[in-house]
Amino acid sequence: MDIEAKQILSAGLASLNITASQEYCDTLIAYAELIEAGNHYHSFVAASGRDLVVKHILDSLAPVNIFTNLIAANRYNTIGDFGTGAGLPGIPLALTFPDIHFTLIDRMTKRIQFLESVIAKLSINNVTVLETQAEHCKMQFDIVTFRAFHPFEYKLFKKLFKLCTPNGVIAAYKGKQDRVHSEIIEI
């Protein structure tokens, strides 16, 4: 990863009010490099270098203050990341919240194998992976998150709310605000 991408990561973390040690930054960069290397085989994201840092790593961390408040106010300790793909947003969040347990869930074996490799290479101790579809998952989580793998639909939320603990929440990452509003209206 080039120097510009590293500088953008540092500046982005500062703008998100994330206090970042050198080890934390280095781990995020190492993770981005693993995604870049895995892209040749898995086609995870259509970005590399600076774009990968901005569109995927920093985007995954953008709501960190919301997560901080939810975790503190509700004593949450489990997060399920559905349709995680390359581990987005789960891995950046897991690195940010080392005391919270994350389960990264995907239905594709090759993605699960990639994630297991990433977790081992980066020595991430608060993450497990699960190969399944949302409707077959038997676990429940304090926070259920997903990153734009489906449009907002009643059926989707019905499935995801079943995966929440009684006081759990869904944290949905979506793109443009106008698109989010139009999808919510349809629900």
Provide a role label for each language-model segment.
Residues 83:
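Conserved glycine-centered beta->alpha loop in an early N-terminal alpha/beta scaffold
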